[in-house]
Each structure stands twice: as structure tokens, then as C-alpha cells.
Amino acid sequence: LCAWFAVPDGAEAGSGRRVAVLAFDADNTLVVGRSLPFTRSYPSLTVTHAQAHLFEREVWEQHGVIPEGHPWLKPVRSSAGTAPANGTFFRVDGAEVHEVAVGPIHAGIIEPGHFRFQCAGEEVLHLEIALGYQHRGVERALPGGPHRATMSQMETVSGDATIAHATAYATVLEALCGAEAPLRSQWLRALALELERLANHVGDLGGLANDVAFLPTAAACGKIRGDFLNLPDLVCGN
């Protein structure tokens, strides 16, 4: 299950269709399925397919459609006009168990997120993550487009995945139009995507080293990441 969301269908609140995107590894394909119109509630799939839990929570939060039988139904980003609000966090009981709350403001230059740890000594028993502090409603800006600002919006969805999001959006438009990008463009996209991947993976390795206070490796990875980030200048001048 790659994606699952709801599309409003009519003026009645809580009405719409569910759209799911499924990936099949056997033949490397994606399939899009759409449900019949529904209102108010539907049987939760999380009970049998755990990967659906976050999607169902988001559909409930955005459209008020209740997944009946969902084992842990609570907001993803907002509740009662306050954002974000993750509801009640999972808690582990025990005399030696302590809770650690981290974020959303962090010491490093990263996007905000709240992390709730349940620990017993040095052992982390459970981690729950609350995101969405920078949710900007990009999805709702897309209908009726593409607009002049659409590609810029795609490039700024996530700062470290500019090429990935821009390429994904371009390929969606090409598929809808029945068009195919020139071979040269496909090669340039592949090259840019690989450079972005290398920069991110090297940055992650440096982050792991920094988290365990192994600073020489962290510094080396930072330098190498900078080299990868500068290489696109040779390709497109930026």
C-alpha cells in the first residue's frame, strides 16, 4: 500500500471516494483503485492491514470519515483548530519506565518533529513520532492547475528531495497527457536523481556518526555531501 486518500464527492460533509495506490513487486507496477461513494464511515482495514493505520487517521482528520474498528484513532496533524495535536501518546507502565519527550524544536537545523520515547534504563521500549508542524496544504493548491507556481511548489515540498518531487510531478503530467519525455531529458533526470540520492545518503551516514559522537566521520561525510550537492552545477548551472 503506497498511498491512500479520500476525494470529496458532492457537497455533503463526510462523503467521498477512497483512492488507493498499490505496488506489485513481482512485475514492478502500480495500480490505482477507487471505491464506490461512501458517507460517514467504513470498515477499517487497519485491523487486518497495519500499514493502513496512518492513512485512515488522515482521511478521518481531513474529511470526518470514521474507520470503524480502527484500534488507535487519533489526529495526525491537527485537532479542534490547534495544529499539530497528536492526541494521547502510547504509554508503557512500570516502576522503572520513564518517558522522554524530544522536539519539535531541535538543536540541529532539521524540520520539526516531536518524538515520544518510552524507556527502561538505556533500552527504548517504544517510540511514537508526531509530524506535520510544517504542513502547508500543498495538495489543496494543486486542483485546477498546473499553475505558474506549481512546479516551484513541488520543488519545495521537501528541501532535500527537490529533484525527486519535481520529477514525480512531471512524470504524472506526462502520463496524463500521454506524452513521453525525450531520451536526453530522461538521462538528465536520472543523473540528477542519483546525485540527490548520494547527497542524502552520505548526509544520513554523517548524521548517524554524529549521533554517536564520532565526529571525524561526521565531518568527512559533510564534506563529501557538499561535493555531491555542487555537482549539479556542472549539469544545469545551479
Predicted features along the sequence, with ranges:
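Hydrophobic alpha-helical scaffolding
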Residues: L45, H49, E155, G159-I163, ...
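Structured, non-membrane catalytic/scaffold regions adjacent to prosthetic-group chemistry
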Residues: V47, Q51-P71, G178-E194, H201-L208, ...
